[in-house]
Amino acid sequence: MPSAFVQVFRTPDLRKKTVFTLGVIVLYRLGSHVPLPGVDYGNVQRCVDQASGSGGLLGLANVFSGGALLQITLFALGILPYITASIILQLLTVVVPRLETLKKEGSAGQGKITQYTRYLTVGLALVQGTGLVATARSGALFPACRTASGIVPDTSVLAAVVMVLTVTAGTACVMWLAELITDRGIGNGMSLLIFVSIASTLPRALWAVKEQGEIAGGWLSFGSVVLVGLVMVALVVFVEQGQRRIPVQYAKRMVGRRSYGGTATYIPLKVNQAGVVPVIFASSLLYIPALIAQFSHSDSGWAAWITRNFVRGDHPFYVVAYFLLIVFFAFFYVAITFNAEEVAGNIRQAGGFVPGIRAGRPTAEYLGYVLNRLTWPGSLYLGLIALVPTVAFAGLGGANQLTGTSILIIVSVGLETVKQINSQIEQHSYEGFLR
């Protein structure tokens, strides 16, 4: 890996892309520290300091925004609306015939879907921005802070509209920066910005664990968290690299005097075919009842029950519900994103076949059977990765940000980026033979 990064800076084209990507990342981090107009930044900082190390309903969104959400900055929503819009469009592609047709039209259809994703991102940003501003003005963003109601001194409608439009424009800017990285930089822009956002919160979270530790000056807690984190990173790397390769053989054809086909390839089916999406789905679904309870009367029985069972991530009821939702969404997402019949049809049209399996429907059934067997350990792995840090680090200040979701995203994005860098290095190494 170190030699690959050295090779990047020796290749002019890759060096230019790397510098461009780093420049965009710097702009993104700068925007994450620009406060929204009408926000009392000093008051926000006092409330954030009091809330540091405690759990929160918006914890996942705050981590995805690099801490900008609770800071109420220009990029407070971060890349989350874009992620949500992309997932929604991906799901709708399966059930909306028009979108499915666009998906099959190649680059032109994909461009149209990208345009729809942008529109949906802006719409979601308006809704989420309105919710953020309303939460901040009511003081519910920092329920434990006594001065939370003074975060937004100006309570006029005009001030609220300006704040919502500003945070929506910030989301559109983040989306533009992500697409710039994808088009002119290295790696996937959306994934890299998530990577940067999560990585930026880790040093502060680790230091909070050390500061609030009670044994050996907090160094024992700090070392335990680091050790568990390293073990989980190794586990994620091992599982994310694991795949089942379905062999595909293409028959040899004679066209004139030339022979075509006769090659062998494979279909890579990953153990974790669903990625991190099931964890995001499960987290979002569990946040809804807790968020409703937060805005309701605290003396009501059902609100107290939800707060008691759903706010703390180490509560047994929460753990069981979270785990079952992750397993369910893992199977659900794999079922709608991997169309075994379509893959089998494409193989058949290209003159290929899986050795020992008849082409057509038997191949589709075989692919579905293998994928279901892979999804079971993959879903259990996702559930364990998401829950082990939450349960193991319960009671450690700042450790609520060191979630399995964060580790999973950081490792996955890192592996994918390194693969793309190696691919581009190999491509440049063959340029001399192609001239």
Regions found by a protein language model. Give the residues of each.
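N-terminal cationic and glycine-rich segments that engage phosphates or anionic surfaces
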Residues: 1-103, 108-435
